[in-house]
């Protein structure tokens, strides 16, 4: 009876020791290699952040392009040239 009790307790301990100690499962697949390849396969590729040429910001993250545009326009909401260019479009929209 004592032999069966020792085997009952010993077999799971030996099994877990072999699995965790050697890092292998059945068919000799290594746990550590599989995890590392799976982890690298799931990692997204690094995205290179580039500042858009349309927007430029200062060190505080404020939009400096809008500042320049407003300064050039004289702090008007829209430039006179821009209104003159879009006048036919506005007229068409109002007519519809």
Swiss-Prot record:
Positions contributing to a divalent metal cation binding: 81, 85, 89, 93
Tissue specificity: Expressed by the venom duct.
Subcellular localization: Secreted
Positions where Asparagine amide occurs in the chain: 96
Alphabetical UniProt keywords: Amidation, Calcium, Gamma-carboxyglutamic acid, Hydroxylation, Ion channel impairing toxin, Ionotropic glutamate receptor inhibitor, Magnesium, Metal-binding, Neurotoxin, Postsynaptic neurotoxin, Secreted, Signal, Toxin
PROSITE patterns: CONANTOKIN
UniProt propeptide residues: 22-78
Outcome after substituting residue 93 to K: No change in activity
Cofactor(s) listed in the protein's UniProt record: Ca(2+); Mg(2+)
Predominant cellular place of this UniProt entry's protein: secreted
Source species, domain of life: Eukaryota
Task of the protein: Conantokins inhibit N-methyl-D-aspartate (NMDA) receptors. This toxin has antagonist activity on the NR2B/GRIN2B subunit (IC(50)=0.1 uM). In vivo, when delivered into the brain, is active has anticonvulsant activity in the model of epilepsy in mice.
The protein's name in its UniProt record: Conantokin Rl-B
Organism expressing this protein natively: Conus rolani
